[in-house]
Amino acid sequence: MRHAFELVLKDGILILKNIQIEYCGSDRNEIYENKEPLEYIEQRGHNLMKLLNEFRNNYNSLELEEDFPKAIEPVLNNLHQADRSSTEFRYGMRADTDPSYIDSASLCKELSEQFDKLENVIDYAYGTVKSRYSTQRQNEPTAQAASS
């Protein structure tokens, strides 16, 4: 599940940046620091908190009515603290360490809820900005006709 969060954050960053380019007139080279999108996102690394911060900053830059959900950060921070290197959950435990015991049912439920929230944030941002842009475009001919 940790890897899924990393991937949805990276995907979300790309989507939010593309929204900025497509609908907000942002410069592609500036947004992606003169890199191709995949090269840019690969260089973001595996740190969940850094990815979350970049995701949230991109979301907030769109100036949407809905605030970024606060409940996501503590869950991602817990995952980050448990697996800073992004390898612990992938490879289990090392032979020389003691195993960790968790309430996996509760953990899975909480992770699933926050994962869904992240996906909803992406959908909300895309839908809202696209709708705002479409409305502006529809109003442009009306404004131009009125000024003629």
Question: Where in this protein do the model-derived segments appear?
Answer:
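Short, hydrophobic, well-ordered secondary-structure elements
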Residues: 1-16
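Long, charged low-complexity segments
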Residues: 21-148
